[in-house]
C-alpha cells in the first residue's frame, strides 16, 4: 500500500543531511547508510549510496529512473541458490 500523498515521501534526516553535504561539496565518495526505508529524492541523482543489506553495504548508483523508489529495493537481502536437485533424475 503506497504512502499517503498528504504525508509526502519519507527520508531519514541524517541521510538527507549527508546527501545535501555531498551535493554541496561535490564529493563522489559513497554515502554509507542503514536506512533502507528512505525514498530516493531527485537531489540524490548521480550519487553512490552504500545501502546495508544486513551483512554488508551494497553500493547503489542513483539514476533518474530510481526517483520515488526506496533504497532497500536496490540492495537484496536474500541470496537464491536454486532448488534442491532431484537425486533420482540426476543418476539417469
From Swiss-Prot:
GO terms for biological process: ribosomal small subunit assembly; translation. One of its GO terms (cellular component) is small ribosomal subunit. Keywords: Ribonucleoprotein, Ribosomal protein, RNA-binding, rRNA-binding. GO terms for molecular function: rRNA binding; structural constituent of ribosome. It holds the Pfam family Ribosomal_S19. The keyword rRNA-binding applies. Protein S19 forms a complex with S13 that binds strongly to the 16S ribosomal RNA. Belongs to the universal ribosomal protein uS19 family. HAMAP family: Ribosomal_uS19. This is Small ribosomal subunit protein uS19. It comes from Sodalis glossinidius (strain morsitans).
